A protein has these predicted regions:
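Beta-turn initiation residues at beta-strand->coil junctions
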Residues: 51, 99-100, 179-182
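Bacterial Sec-dependent N-terminal signal peptides
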Residues: 1-28
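Flexible, surface-exposed loop/linker segments and immediately adjacent secondary-structure boundaries
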Residues: 110-145
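Gly/Pro-enriched, hydrophobic low-complexity segments
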Residues: 132-135, 139-206
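An acidic-aromatic
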Residues: 69-118, 188-189
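N-terminal leader/targeting segments and the immediate start of mature chains
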Residues: 18-64, 205
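A short, surface-exposed beta-strand/turn
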Residues: 68-69, 73-75, 89-91, 164-177
Length: 206
């Protein structure tokens, strides 16, 4: 997935930029920690989301394809994710994948990972804690909400992900949008359309 990085003067500029980036990074990390504490304090969450893809290299431009909708229930390490025609149920020990089209169930001994370069909704609260540098991005008004973006840059220069722009609702401290730019320039956008916390969940959910 390619994108979206007189000697004395140059030295001064580099030093100045590194100081600003460090301060900027501390501010960004503080906000991320606030989000993690706020959302992590809920007993559970039910999230409805949509994803969209732009990949000009593959001829997929903005608006060419309808968004894919999904929903997820999260409780601690457990989750029930419905996405792309599959249901993923993780009971904190095993992952059950139900393929409704093929009418088959597979069982994995571990959780979903990002080996395919995609950040799954189940990882929203934890994916950034390791392997990224942070800096504050733009503050944008979206649908009447002030969304503060944080730019996350992978430390691994060989990562399939070039950067992740994480949009946080300034008022609620909830994650609203995630825009992931791949090494091939493809952009995957995940938007949280609704979030409910501390709901009464059935025992059969996980």
């Amino acid at each position: 997935m390619d994108n979206v990085r007189k000697i004395v003067l140059l030295t001064i500029m580099l030093v100045s930029n590194s100081i600003v980036f460090s301060q900027n990074g501390e501010t960004a990390k503080k906000l991320l920690d606030e989000v993690s504490i706020k959302m992590g304090a809920y007993t559970n969450m039910q999230i409805v989301f949509s994803t969209s893809l732009i990949n000009e290299e593959a001829g997929i431009n903005e608006g060419d394809e309808p968004p894919h909708n999904g929903k997820i229930a999260l409780q601690g390490e457990k989750y029930n994710l419905e996405y792309l025609g599959n249901t993923f149920i993780f009971d904190s020990k095993k992952l059950y994948v139900i393929n409704h089209d093929e009418k088959e169930i597979t069982v994995n001994e571990d959780d979903l990972n990002e080996d395919d370069g995609f950040i799954y909704p189940s990882k929203l609260l934890t994916f950034y804690k390791e392997g990224y540098n942070y800096k504050m991005g733009k503050l944008i008004n979206m649908n009447g909400r002030k969304i503060q973006f944080i730019e996350l840059i992978p430390i691994d220069s060989n990562s399939e992900i070039i950067k992740v722009d994480l949009g946080i609702d300034q008022k609620t401290k909830h994650i609203y949008k995630l825009i992931q730019t791949g090494a091939n320039g493809a952009k995957t956008t995940l938007t949280i359309n609704s979030l409910k916390s501390d709901q009464q969940l059935s025992e059969m959910t996980f």
